[in-house]
A protein has these predicted regions:
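Beta1-alpha1 glycine-rich phosphate/pyrophosphate-binding loop at the start
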Residues: 3-71
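FAD-binding core/adjacent interface of flavoenzyme oxidoreductases
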Residues: 1-8, 23-24, 29, 61, ...
Length: 121
């Protein structure tokens, strides 16, 4: 299958992009290497999320994933190891050996915290 769009990164930006891509009637695959929801899932209490007085980051991550999937977005828990553009398509290769092809690619890999290597960090 050739997807209209592949989104690399399943955090808030990637999942929101996938939701809007599906609402536009395009096929989309979201590839995330660790956990869907991104860094927000590390927050135990979020008090500035519209519509909620208080909600956990994990709940926000779950809601974003559920909404994207409800719209028809496909999701894969894979690590992307390479991307190549040949001709009109782009090929995304994962560590498992799986290959996916798309017409457009969004890279929404977010960030990760730096660690000091301390015990119990």
């Amino acid at each position: 299958m050739i997807y209209d769009v592949i989104v690399i990164g399943g955090g808030p930006a990637g999942l929101t992009a996938a939701t809007y891509i599906r609402r536009a009637g395009k096929s989309v695959l979201v590839i995330e290497k660790a956990a869907f929801g991104g860094q927000i899932t590390r927050s135990s209490n979020v008090e500035n999320f519209p519509g909620y007085i208080s909600v956990s980051g994990a709940q926000i991550g779950d809601m974003l994933l559920e909404q994207a999937m409800n719209q028809g977005a496909e999701v894969e828990l894979e690590e992307v190891v390479s991307v190549s553009a040949a001709g009109e398509g782009k090929t995304v290769v994962c560590a498992s050996g799986a290959e996916y092809t798309c017409r457009a690619l969004i890279i929404a890999t977010g960030a990760k915290p730096r660690t000091l290597g301390l015990e119990n960090e």
